Amino acid sequence: MPRPRRFRRILGEPRVVTFSPEASDEETGVEITLDEFEAIRLRDYHDIKQKKAAEIMGISQPTFHRTLTSARGKIAAALVEGRPIILKGGDYITDRRRYKCMDCQFEWISPEKEYKKCPDCGSENINVVSAETIPRFGRGGYGRGFGAGRGAPRVCKCIECGYEAPKTPGVPCRTEKCPKCGAPMCGAD
């Protein structure tokens, strides 16, 4: 039994879905799936390296390469044969809203809901982050995953005596006081 196809992440649907030659009498167009369109957009239009583009789409680099090669072949056939290009279909999910709290550094994705406050600490100091602009760390500019990979802290630590307590979800560590010395706590892992 073959493995199920993994959904590809696209950052938005194209504004135009059909490209047609001016004097085209050809009725059958070349269909390019939206995941193939996204591969072309990331690699050829934005000039993002294949490894990073594959991470953005949530697929492996070999799968990204196959998708890109397929799209380029279809576009070449349409140009040479004078056929229309139709963008539609494919196995994809949209990733329009990626959020990051600037106070507690918590990151989350929500394609349906628009957030005004951080679900972890309640801060209104949040930014919508594009997957293309997320900085990578480590040798060569690429790391494993987003940012430093820590996410929100799981432990609150006293800055004076070193006392540690489990973090309460939705309550920023900086609002907690150390039960031993009364000093403010901070997030730590």
Curated annotation (Swiss-Prot):
Report the InterPro entries cross-referenced here: RNA_pol_sigma_r3/r4-like, UPF0251, WH-like_DNA-bd_sf
Superkingdom to which the source organism belongs: Archaea
The Swiss-Prot or TrEMBL record describes its family as follows:
Belongs to the UPF0251 family.
Official protein name in the record: UPF0251 protein MTH_1178
The species is Methanothermobacter thermautotrophicus (strain ATCC 29096 / DSM 1053 / JCM 10044 / NBRC 100330 / Delta H)
